[in-house]
């Protein structure tokens, strides 16, 4: 018996409309940040493989933090690094724990529907059907802030 390690093609599972929305946000002057529980190695691997790394101004891994989501530590750490206040940002999350972490950090959160998982997203400020819907919500809100965590 043999096994071969297969490389996952992350672009195949990239959220639809991400490649449309990221350039739109950057063109409007928004700064984008990833605040993920994944390792920095994995964050960089995925963003490079999908050709989206250059859109992000900051990438934060929660691996080195003592607490993980739903604890707000990763969001509080990112706010500290960027010298921002919670009211200056908005997060797009899909998981229950991610939404709870945003709430714990007093950050507004758009929940992107997670069809693959049975996440409770009721605590989010609003639920978007996909990333394009989240982008349209942001435009509707006409936010003056210019930082987003995803």
Language-model segments: what does each one mean?
Residues 23-26, 39-40, 44-150:
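Asp-based, Mg2+/Mn2+-dependent phosphohydrolase catalytic module
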Residues 1-20, 28:
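Metal-dependent phosphoesterase signature
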């Amino acid at each position: 018996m043999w096994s071969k390690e297969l490389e996952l093609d992350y672009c195949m599972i990239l959220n639809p409309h991400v490649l449309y929305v990221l350039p739109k946000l950057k063109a409007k002057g928004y700064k984008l940040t990833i605040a993920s529980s994944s390792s920095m190695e994995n964050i960089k691997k995925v963003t490079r493989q999908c050709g989206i790394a250059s859109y992000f101004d900051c990438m934060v891994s929660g691996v080195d933090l003592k607490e993980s989501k739903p604890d707000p530590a990763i969001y509080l750490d990112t706010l500290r690094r960027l010298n921002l206040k919670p009211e200056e940002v908005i997060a797009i999350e899909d998981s229950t724990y991610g939404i709870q972490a945003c709430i714990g950090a007093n950050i507004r959160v758009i929940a992107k529907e997670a069809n693959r998982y049975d996440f409770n997203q009721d605590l989010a400020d609003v639920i978007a059907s996909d990333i394009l819907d989240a982008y349209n919500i942001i435009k509707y809100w006409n936010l003056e802030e210019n930082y987003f965590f995803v």
